[in-house]
Curated annotation (Swiss-Prot):
Protein name: Protein AaeX
Keyword annotations: Cell membrane, Membrane, Transmembrane, Transmembrane helix
Top-level lineage group: Bacteria
Membrane topology listed for this record: Multi-pass membrane protein
Key word Transmembrane helix present: yes
NCBIfam families: PRK11594.1
Entry annotated with the keyword Transmembrane: yes
Organism: Yersinia pestis
Gene expressing this chain: aaeX
Length: 67
């Protein structure tokens, strides 16, 4: 028996962190959509690495908000 509550959606069980991952993913798409027209990606050396770091920061902020 697990100590953490499990979300069950249509018979599929998800860990409690799943909601935080989805919220941070939605925030990531919004922030990326805002940053692309500003031209910030022209100053970034590696856009994929920047996107990964941005998602990690947003996930950290989201998880701190929920805890």
């Amino acid at each position: 028996m697990s100590l953490l509550p499990v979300m069950v959606i249509f018979g599929l069980s998800f860990p409690p962190i799943f909601l935080e991952l989805l919220i941070s993913l939605a925030l990531f798409f919004v922030v990326r959509r805002i940053l692309q027209p500003t031209g910030i990606y022209e100053f970034v050396w590696h856009p994929a690495l920047f996107n990964t770091a941005l998602y990690c920061c947003l996930f950290y902020l989201t998880s701190r908000l929920f805890s």
